[in-house]
Amino acid sequence: MSVAAAITAGASAAQAGTGLIGSIANAIHEGTRLKLQGQALGAQIKFQEAENKFNRDRFEFDKLNTERWFRLAKEQQSLVYELNTKGPAMRAQAMMDAGFRNNLYSNGNQLTFNEVREAQLSAEKRFYNPSLF
């Protein structure tokens, strides 16, 4: 074997070894890259699941809030209708329950018999016993 052939054989063996080491390093690098991509994909999937859960919960909250506001608006509408239709009668009944006189045909200046009697008794007491008042 000539020297040139030996050098050529040695060079090709060195290249084969370098290629082998390079391919092993590339395989390790590729495996690490795939592992990191898998972890990143897993984290992205978890984030999307959390985001979807948040959006579903927010939708449910908005739905409950909307139903609540609708119910309140409906109650207010019925209360306004009831006060518009029955308000004067309810006011008159409340005044009568509180002890006020309520005569629909009165202009407010007429006194009932009991009121006149009470005024006369009060005037009489003040006239005869001024120190009491």
From Swiss-Prot:
Give the UniProt keywords, A-Z: Capsid decoration protein, Capsid protein, Host cytoplasm, Virion
Localisation? Virion; Host cytoplasm
Purpose of the protein: Minor structural protein that forms a portal-like structure at a unique three-fold axis of symmetry, following binding to the host receptor. The channel formed by VP2 may allow the delivery of the viral genome through the host endosomal membrane.
- The species this protein was found in: Canine calicivirus (strain 48) (CaCV)
> The organism sits in which domain of life?
Viruses
Cellular compartments per GO CC: host cell cytoplasm; viral capsid, decoration
What is the protein's major site of localization? Answer: virion
User: What does the record's free text say on domains?
Assistant: The N-terminus domain points away from the virion surface.
The UniProt subunit note reads as follows: Homooligomer. The portal-like structure consists in 12 copies of VP2. Interacts with capsid protein VP1.
Q: Which family does it belong to?
A: Belongs to the vesivirus VP2 protein family.
Q: What is this protein called?
A: Minor capsid protein VP2
Keyword Acyltransferase, does the record have it? no
Q: Further notes on this entry?
A: Translated by a ribosomal termination-reinitiation process from the bicistronic mRNA coding for VP1 and VP2.
